[in-house]
Regions:
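Intrinsically disordered, low-complexity Pro/Gly/Ser/Thr-rich segments with frequent PxxP/GP/PP motifs
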Residues: 1-3, 90-119, 196
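Long, low-complexity ectodomains and other extracytoplasmic segments of secretory-pathway proteins
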Residues: 6, 17-69, 137-187
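Short, well-ordered beta-strand segments
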Residues: 29, 41-43, 71-81, 85, ...
Length: 196
């Protein structure tokens, strides 16, 4: 019933067969009658942010407890990237953060992420890893999620990997020097070479 008391119950029931006298199974169950949670992030869908290499980037989002009860929320972050990250929140244990939220309360969930250097063209411009923040309710264990992508800004860079020995050129004459030039940025690049 809708007005049932919040409680934990243990029950068992037996399964018997009319056609097989040997079939007699007993099943035990734990029943938890709990209040309904209603956690909502302030953003829907997947967000995308442009980031620069080698910058510690902060990302924050608001979350609201729209339920009628205090909710002790546990936050976790999931990503397939190897980028370093951590919580910008007061209550942290291991890789999780915690907030106790009164009904109709709004809180800020904040993390930092260390964006790595662009190395040998990776990560490419306008690409990057996805991060997902999970908020688990203490009321009914429901999970609310918000995902965001960190997309790398353009980085133009080049290296001279190999060059022949120095070349002296007399006035009114020409010569050639071979050089191996490599684009190590994360976007197409036009290289200009200046001789001195």
């Amino acid at each position: 019933p809708a007005n049932a008391d919040f409680q934990n119950l243990s029950t068992t029931f037996s399964i018997l067969s009319d056609t097989d006298a040997d079939l007699n199974e007993t099943v035990s169950m734990e029943i938890h009658i709990v209040p309904h949670s209603n956690l909502n992030f302030g953003v829907e869908g997947v967000s995308a942010f442009t980031v620069d290499e080698m910058v510690r980037t902060s990302v924050a989002v608001n979350i609201t407890n729209n339920a009628s009860y205090v909710d002790n929320v546990v936050f976790s972050l999931h990503t397939n990237s190897g980028w370093g990250w951590g919580w910008n929140m007061p209550s942290i244990s291991g890789n999780e953060a915690y907030i106790s939220m009164e009904p109709d309360a709004l809180a800020i969930v904040s993390i930092w992420i260390d964006v790595p250097a662009v190395v040998d063209g990776a990560p490419l411009a306008n690409t990057g890893p996805r991060f997902q923040i999970d908020a688990v309710s203490s009321l009914d264990k429901a999970v609310s999620t918000w995902s965001f992508d960190l997309q790398m800004n353009e980085k133009k860079n080049a290296t001279i990997d190999d060059i022949e020995a120095s070349l002296s050129v007399a006035p009114n004459s020409d010569g050639r020097v071979s050089a191996l030039v490599r684009n190590v940025g994360n976007t197409p690049n036009t290289l200009n070479i200046t001789l001195q």
